[in-house]
Design a protein with these regions (language model features):
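Multi-pass alpha-helical transmembrane bundles in non-GPCR membrane proteins
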Residues: 1-238
Length: 238
């Protein structure tokens, strides 16, 4: 079995030194670790290129509010990819436990930031704006919980992540967001990937489980990025 949440928390209370991950049965094989490393390297490269491209395009062609939204989204994107890599690849020690808090917090930031890119358009209605405000409030509470109560609300957090992600259905149903159908399909594809991929997140006995889960998440992020890019592009040309 992998190191549990309680084991990592106990190490965080013992002192600042890092120990061999194998000492507490963090038994990912070398091949599994390399696979996870490769996926995170690809993810970081993708994030840097994607964020850079989005920001350059927004700065050259989009209105001010869209530039702000693109900047917030890029911050969320890079935060998720960076903290995921740092947390998952760091040796088991107190530092890893702290990185775990930021890893979980970054997910809330990215979800709220993603929908910000769709609602800043001047055509967005009151309901859509209220949904966005609600998402940011939930994100703020989630970040506070992840930082102050690490490891105690993990199952609830997963449900909150999924619920926030599928809030796109609300935005689409109220018809108050000028969301192109292609962008909507990309968001649905991303949500479906993460939701279905949760089986890999909890299937700890599966070899390469961690790498497979992170690959699924990366594919979902790519779908959501494509949706954001398409919306920013369409708004820049209107």
């Amino acid at each position: 079995m992998r190191a549990s949440t309680n084991e990592i928390r106990e190490m965080a209370l013992q002192g600042p030194s890092c120990r061999d991950p194998g000492a507490i049965d963090w038994n990912y094989t070398r091949a599994e670790t390399i696979a996870d490393l490769a996926i995170h390297v690809v993810g970081l490269c993708f994030g840097l290129i994607a964020a850079g491209s989005l920001l350059v395009h927004a700065a050259l062609h989009a209105p001010t509010m869209n530039i702000v939204a693109a900047s917030i989204y890029s911050l969320g994107l890079l935060s998720v990819l960076t903290f995921s890599a740092a947390y998952n690849l760091w040796p088991v020690c107190p530092v890893k436990w702290w990185l775990r808090r930021f890893d979980q917090s970054a997910i809330y930031l990215l979800i709220a930031a993603t929908y910000t890119a769709f609602v800043v358009d001047k055509k967005a209605g009151t309901t859509a704006v209220c949904v966005l405000i609600g998402l940011w409030c939930i994100a703020a509470l989630g970040i506070a919980a992840a930082l102050a109560l690490p490891g105690r609300l993990d199952r609830l957090a997963i449900g909150v992540y999924v619920g926030m992600g599928w809030s796109v259905g609300v935005l689409w149903s109220v018809k108050e967001v000028p969301l192109p159908f292609g962008a909507f399909l990309l968001l649905v594809a991303g949500g479906a990937l993460v939701t279905a991929g949760l089986i890999f997140h909890v299937w700890h006995g599966l070899r390469f489980q961690n790498a497979i889960w992170h690959l699924v998440v990366l594919l979902a992020i790519a779908c959501q990025y494509a949706a954001v890019l398409s919306v920013v592009t369409s708004q820049a040309t209107t």
